[in-house]
Amino acid sequence: RDLRMSRGLGDVYKRQWLACLRWEGDGIEGDSDGDVAAHALIDALLSAAGLGDIGTLFGVGSQSDGAGKHGAEMLRTTVDYLNERGMKPVSASVVVIANRPKIGKHREEAERALSEAIGCEVSMTATTTDGMGFTGSGEGVAAIADALVEPVDPSTRQAV
């Protein structure tokens, strides 16, 4: 079985959207919805498939194809892009690095939203930096994602 794995690190944003869910709190600064978890997952998926990164697929800046788009929509576009090129997600995980928001009570809902967007199981965990740095002071949120993909027949989307 030809499995490929990679890691993605999302750009750092003030939070509003995270793991395809709307969170209470400060707004975001980003070209799309600023969903750092979704963006890290996109980078991991594309990198594992050898297809570049989020900027390769969507472009960068306010004029990019991702401008104004929701993280779930961008994830679905990414999976379609992988499928068309003979790859599909097998599993993924996302680690959110932040003191706020607290992920625990919404973790299962976030996992479901991410899993539905990419069509495979996604696990999510969170950690803090114990008050250190911009994530510790609540100025922003970071995320790291790992993704496992496998080759598929583009016409059937079945593993080869």
Language-model segment annotations:
Residues 30, 34, 38, 67-71, ...:
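Generic structural signal for well-ordered, non-membrane alpha-helical segments
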Residues 11-22:
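Polyampholytic, low-complexity intrinsically disordered segments
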Residues 37, 41, 45:
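Active-site His/Glu-centered metal-binding helix of metallohydrolases
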Residues 44-88:
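Glycine- and Gly-Pro-enriched alpha-helical subdomains that act as flexible
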Residues 1-13:
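Single conserved hydrophobic/aromatic residue that forms the stacking wall/gate
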Residues 92-136:
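Short, conserved loop-to-beta-strand elements that form functional interface hotspots
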Residues 135-156:
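C-terminal edge-of-domain segments
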